Amino acid sequence: MEKPSREAFEGNNKLLIGIVLSVITFWLFAQSLVNVVPILEDSFNTDIGTVNIAVSITALFSGMFVVGAGGLADKYGRIKLTNIGIILNILGSLLIIISNIPLLLIIGRLIQGLSAACIMPATLSIIKSYYIGKDRQRALSYWSIGSWGGSGVCSFFGGAVATLLGWRWIFILSIIISLIALFLIKGTPETKSKSISLNKFDIKGLVLLVIMLLSLNILITKGSELGVSSLLFITLLAIAIGSFSLFIVLEKRATNPLIDFKLFKNKAYTGATASNFLLNGVAGTLIVANTFVQRGLGYSSLQAGSLSITYLVMVLIMIRVGEKLLQTLGCKKPMLIGTGVLIVGECLISLTFLPEILYVICCIIGYLFFGLGLGIYATPSTDTAIANAPLEKVGVAAGIYKMASALGGAFGVALSGAVYAIVSNMTNIYTGAMIALWLNAGMGILSFVIILLLVPKQNDTQL
């Protein structure tokens, strides 16, 4: 049950613009570092391993804490958590740009991950509270433009800003956007859930989740260097499995769990969240394809980012189309169509054995299908997850959904990068890129199957 103050307030364009601007602080600005790794190596006078940690740690920490932040948004207020997230982004951005110390770069990126963890579930909950029916679907479309669209633009945006203005301007602009978002959201009535206000926060669950995900991330990113038979690898694997098992047991017994597994009794919510995890995992495509054309074809970072222009254009256009398809066809068909089109695009981008000109053409067309598919999928998937969450748990439900987004992206990039490196060392860079991109296509196929089996034609909105 919501606080009475929200009953007299209806979401407007001012609030929606503020929400979208807060969302792109992560999906556009923070994620844009994927295309400026060599520049950061020179600027901070450090090795690629340190820079890769800084690049990936934002999505990882966002994924680890987003569910807990969703619970805090329900308990203490969604407007409050959104504002805290925006302020954290400003702080993180300042730490990144004020010096050339690698440690401050990593700390700043970590804080940006916490910022995204606060912003994503809180803003989805605000949309659930203050927008109804078609207005909510429209608001979710623009929210998706901020997230999916931001992720589509980030590669080109990062390369362009770094080349034309210098990489620090990425975060200077992020600070400016954050201040505008704070101004636009100011004055919005607070919205929170009364039903869980007296419950204790699940610290044990959060600690176990962090231990599990950090162990798993190290296994993926450093596993080939450690060796599967090494003591450290086996120890980390045991920690990951043990913490996961203990997490499941404790969460099922907890009165106010970090992850409420009762939410997954709804097949539509489960299908939307699982497919969302996998389709965010195909973010590994950008890392692999960008690295391949730079190392294999000799392209610059700006040229590499330019190949994905069709992706960013199509994802921005098709998100609103996905909204219209949602209104006319329901959730399932657009989600299936979008995923199917994405798989076709992924396969085209994987044709690294072709001559350069033919591959570039396939890449441009492939990115077009990639953006087309994600754009169609985005709004129906988000609407399915939010519509199938009870109002008093919408913050937690949104947190789990966006946890799937962040962790899907983090582990998709890690897995794709690991496969690319291992296969390239065993064979050559062309085969390595192709196999890594096939991995991404496989995640798309699995997502298609999950949607087909779990998302009903007519969603039951009661859990």
UniProtKB/Swiss-Prot annotation:
Localization of this protein: Cell membrane
GO biological process, one term: response to antibiotic
Keywords of the record: Antibiotic resistance, Cell membrane, Membrane, Transmembrane, Transmembrane helix, Transport, Virulence
Gene Ontology molecular function, alphabetical: transmembrane transporter activity
Primary residence: membrane
Induction of expression: Transcription is highly induced in abscesses. Up-regulated by MgrA. Down-regulated during stationary-phase.
Annotated TM spans: 17-37, 53-73, 86-106, 107-127, 142-162, 165-185, 201-221, 230-250, 273-293, 299-319, 334-354, 357-377, 403-423, 435-455
Organism superkingdom: Bacteria
Membrane topology: Multi-pass membrane protein
Entry annotated with the keyword NAD: no
Annotated GO CC locations: plasma membrane
Similarity comment text for this entry: Belongs to the major facilitator superfamily. TCR/Tet family.
Function noted in UniProt: Multidrug efflux pump that acts independently of NorA and is one of the factors that confers resistance against diverse quinolones and chemical compounds. Can facilitate bacterial survival in vivo when overexpressed in an abscess and may contribute to the relative resistance of staphylococcal abscesses to antimicrobial therapy.
Protein name: Quinolone resistance protein NorB
Protein species of origin: Staphylococcus aureus (strain MW2)
Gene giving rise to this polypeptide: norB
